């Protein structure tokens, strides 16, 4: 039996489906899905891993023996030498407090004193997927050969190498081969398995070097920043060798913006049109002096044209220019283009991975921008036309013309640029997937098409002796723009005018303006800047940016640093500037590239990185108090939402020690007891300027961002008139009417929780109450539900009016569930509750077993 090891379950299934002539049989080994099939008359089985099956970590301590020197001991009793420098103190120690032990140092707990030892502690690999490893070994015992078919890059080669090491524990003599492919098309997979190669151990070692270096740097720096401020693990402050200089780029740009001194300038602009033309045919005109830096000169010129109604055409100039088609997509350029379409780099990679696994696009983590000669471009275009009717006309033109693909600056031999495979069914894709797939498909076609021709018409006008200009671009020859309209400006057609013609002018105004500071990075631009500075890799840049958002060092898009992010970079720049510079990170990445090429060893590169980190840590430990104070001030600044209306001190976001829920409290506590509730399930941020203070009650106003919903602004004071909704009668109580009494159904809003509901005025007698959606203006209709007799109301939301029966147990809910709600019977709810409890208990047990041997150091590693 031939054992084929893929990186994920979907990949295992795809490979089995592509290689077999029939349909693979899905089976299980223990609880792991596998796929059995025949290939070239031989029984085969594919198994998909879950990414890395081994995770790097540290032992609990480093110990010292006079004969053996420094070492660590694994759970299996294996002794690993630790290259602790002679300058660090050895036992016996003068103190018995943690982290000091009788025979060494504990590195399991988070203590500043242990960090110099942690820097040099040996790295071990623990099972991250025990069930998968068990299944893998079971299959290996029954196999006569192994094929590694993980992704062909550093991470994929390392995953394959780790899996192979586990296989060799039970079958050390199995022949091993490697399948390298760039897409899940039948032709590509078949070719890869017909032309097997050897596992590239240098590539795997380079991947492991990065893995170990990022663990060591992330663990040491994260623990240091956390301990400098908090003295414990509860409020982790993340850092890493790539993450920190990336944050420094954003902070550096913000400092440039803060230091920017705006300069005044003036512009004279208006509108023009051919005489008698419709209002829609007007065009923009501006004084030939685009910016007046002298106010008097601007006012003098404006005085000449103020009130002018006509102008004379002094000259008409037409010029054509060619716009060249774009180069093929690499990972960074795809992320930048997708960001311009509103898809973040991290989401782009998640979607691209799903499209790749579905066989719709080629491998998405690439640097290459040159199509290889082996790629049949014409065949891809033909296949694309068959599965994508909307692109069929463009595909036909591409096939009819000379196909000369563009070339980028980077050419590699591992994978081709990102392109659509021409297989699969794009019509089944959801919104985000379809958007990204179209971007890839259209970019691919654009790289095979000719340039676009744009004609510019420039008008020079005389307005009462003052020179004005107008300009417009028109797409004359679409070229590649027929396939790739992204970023194309709307045509600005100038009227057919000649020298000496008279045009009408309107609304000429003098505008005072100021120069703008450098723009903040968009996420797409930040990815490009990281690539330019040598920060991260094509596979890690998006996740690094996502991590910086997750730990609240960054906010918004365009990217803005938080006060905490600024404080950390300012402090690190002052006390350990090398860590914030891209140079050291770029140097380490260069070392890993040399390992990949076989020019250096993993051991040497990791040791070199430890030495660099030791120097950084030595400087930081001298300034722990100053750095901790800076972080503390920044944390308070980020948590501030406004001034307390009672005592004037800061109101800040706080977390309840009992409930772990968020609330707003005064920094003057316990002398000032002002607190405000915070809506649940939202991300809160302060407002700026006049909007930051409520005009009605003087309390702060905040911005609330629900998950995947439109943000809203509220006053934090729940009793404020701006939050108050007058009671609204929506109907009469049916239960009370049947009991011979009158009861009104009134819509209320709870001052304490902010929740809305409908309740009968005789609630104590009838118990009638209905929940309402949290947001949306409520309107009574005076109608009742024909099924249950409850009131019908209209809730006006951002997506339009929503007409509902307020009774959540109404039979109409069974027919057509209300948007965003799901009605269940008490019996089904009880079943689900019981099942949920069992599932939760099982998950907790599994989680405990899986993580029992993992230390908190792994959680601390910031960079991937």
Task: Show the residue positions of the predicted features.
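Amphipathic alpha-helical transducer elements in NTP-driven molecular machines
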Residues: 9-16, 43, 98, 104, ...
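Short, charge-patterned binding micro-sites
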Residues: 185-187, 362, 368
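Long, highly charged, low-complexity internal segments
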Residues: 39-47, 51-125, 234-353, 357, ...
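Intrinsically disordered, low-complexity regulatory segments
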Residues: 1-217, 506
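Basic, low-complexity terminal or inter-domain segments flanking catalytic cores
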Residues: 2-3, 35, 166, 222, ...
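Short, polar/flexible loop-turn hinges at active-site or ligand-entry regions and domain interfaces
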Residues: 124, 150-152, 170-177, 197-204, ...
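C-terminal or mid-to-C-terminal helical accessory/interaction module adjacent to the motor/catalytic core
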Residues: 142, 184-270, 319
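Short glycine-centered, acidic/aromatic-flanked micro-motifs in structured strand/loop junctions
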Residues: 150-152, 336-338, 365
């Amino acid at each position: 039996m031939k054992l084929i090891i893929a990186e994920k379950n979907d990949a295992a299934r795809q490979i089995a489906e592509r290689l077999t002539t029939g349909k693979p049989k899905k089976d299980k080994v223990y609880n792991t899905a596998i796929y059995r099939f025949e290939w070239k008359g031989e029984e085969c089985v594919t198994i998909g891993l879950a990414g890395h099956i081994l995770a790097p970590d540290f032992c609990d301590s480093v110990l010292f023996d006079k004969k053996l020197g420094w070492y660590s001991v694994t759970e299996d009793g294996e002794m690993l030498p630790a290259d602790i420098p002679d300058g660090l103190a050895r036992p016996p120690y003068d103190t018995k407090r943690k982290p000091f032990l009788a025979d060494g140092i504990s590195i399991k707990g988070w203590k500043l004193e242990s960090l110099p030892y942690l820097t040099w502690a040996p790295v071990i690999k623990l099972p991250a997927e025990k069930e998968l490893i068990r299944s893998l070994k079971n299959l290996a015992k029954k196999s006569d050969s192994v094929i590694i078919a993980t992704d062909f890059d550093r991470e994929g080669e390392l995953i394959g190498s780790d899996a192979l090491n586990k296989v060799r524990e039970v079958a050390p003599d199995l022949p091993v081969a490697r399948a390298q492919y760039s897409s899940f098309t039948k032709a590509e997979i078949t070719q890869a398995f017909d032309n097997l190669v050897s596992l590239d151990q240098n590539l795997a070692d380079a991947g492991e070097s990065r893995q170990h270096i990022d663990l060591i740097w992330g663990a040491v720096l994260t623990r240091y920043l956390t301990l400098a401020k908090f003295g414990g693990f509860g409020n982790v402050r993340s850092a890493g060798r790539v993450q920190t200089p990336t944050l420094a780029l954003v902070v550096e740009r913000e400092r440039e913006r803060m230091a920017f001194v705006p300069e005044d300038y003036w512009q004279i602009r208006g509108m023009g049109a051919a005489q008698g033309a419709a209002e829609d045919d007007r065009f923009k005109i501006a004084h030939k002096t685009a910016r007046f830096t002298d106010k008097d000169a601007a006012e003098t010129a404006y005085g000449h044209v103020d009130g002018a109604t006509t102008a004379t055409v002094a000259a008409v100039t037409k010029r054509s220019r060619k716009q060249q088609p774009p180069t093929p997509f690499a990972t960074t350029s795809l992320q930048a283009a997708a960001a311009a379409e509103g898809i973040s780099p991290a989401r782009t990679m998640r979607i691209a991975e799903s499209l790749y696994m579905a066989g719709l696009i080629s491998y998405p983590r690439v640097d290459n921008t040159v199509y290889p000669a082996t790629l049949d471009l014409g065949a891809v275009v033909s296949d694309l036309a068959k599965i994508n009717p909307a692109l069929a006309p463009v595909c036909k033109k591409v096939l009819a013309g000379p196909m000369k693909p563009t070339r980028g600056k980077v050419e590699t031999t591992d994978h081709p640029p990102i392109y659509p495979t021409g297989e699969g069914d794009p019509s089944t894709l959801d919104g985000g997937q379809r958007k990204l797939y179209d971007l890839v498909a259209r970019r691919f076609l654009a790289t095979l098409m000719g340039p676009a021709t744009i004609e510019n018409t420039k008008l020079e006008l005389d307005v009462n002796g003052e020179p004005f200009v107008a300009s417009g671009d028109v797409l004359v020859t679409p070229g590649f723009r027929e396939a790739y309209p992204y970023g194309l400006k709307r045509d600005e057609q100038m009227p057919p005018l000649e020298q000496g013609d008279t045009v009408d002018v309107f609304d000429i105004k003098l505008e005072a303006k100021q120069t703008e500071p450098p723009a903040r990075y968009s996420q797409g631009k930040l990815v490009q800047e990281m690539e330019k500075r040598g920060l991260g890799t094509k596979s890690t840049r998006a996740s690094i940016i996502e991590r910086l958002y997750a730990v609240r060092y960054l906010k918004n898009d365009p990217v803005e640093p938080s006060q905490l992010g600024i404080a950390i970079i300012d402090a690190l720049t002052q006390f350990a500037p090398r860590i914030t510079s891209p140079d050291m990170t770029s140097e380490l990445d260069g070392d890993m590239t040399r390992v990949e090429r076989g020019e250096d060893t993993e051991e040497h590169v990791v040791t070199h990185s430890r030495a660099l980190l030791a120097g950084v840590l030595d400087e930081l430990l001298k300034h722990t108090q100053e750095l901790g104070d800076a972080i503390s001030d920044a944390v308070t600044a980020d948590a501030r939402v406004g001034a307390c209306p009672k005592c004037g001190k800061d109101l800040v976001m706080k977390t309840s020690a009992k409930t772990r829920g968020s609330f707003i409290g005064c920094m003057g506590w316990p002398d000032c007891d002002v607190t405000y509730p915070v809506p649940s399930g939202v991300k809160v941020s302060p407002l700026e300027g006049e909007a930051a203070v409520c005009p009605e009650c003087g309390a702060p106003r905040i911005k609330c961002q629900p998950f995947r919903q439109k943000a809203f602004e509220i006053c934090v004071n729940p009793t404020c008139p701006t939050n108050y909704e007058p009671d609204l009668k929506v109907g009469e109580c049916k239960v009370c009417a049947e009991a011979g009494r009158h009861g009104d159904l009134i819509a209320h809003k709870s001052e304490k929780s902010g929740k809305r509901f409908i309740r009968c005025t005789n609630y104590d007698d009838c118990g009638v109450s209905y929940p309402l959606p949290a947001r949306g203006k409520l309107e009574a209709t005076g109608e009742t539900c024909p099924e249950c007799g409850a009131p019908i109301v209209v809730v006006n939301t951002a997506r339009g009016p929503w007409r509902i029966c307020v009774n959540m147990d109404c039979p109409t809910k069974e027919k057509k569930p209300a948007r965003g709600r799901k009605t269940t019977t008490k019996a089904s709810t009880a079943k689900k509750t019981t099942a949920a409890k069992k599932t939760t208990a099982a998950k907790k047990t599994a989680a405990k077993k899986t993580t029992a041997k993992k230390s908190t150091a792994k959680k601390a590693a910031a960079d991937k």
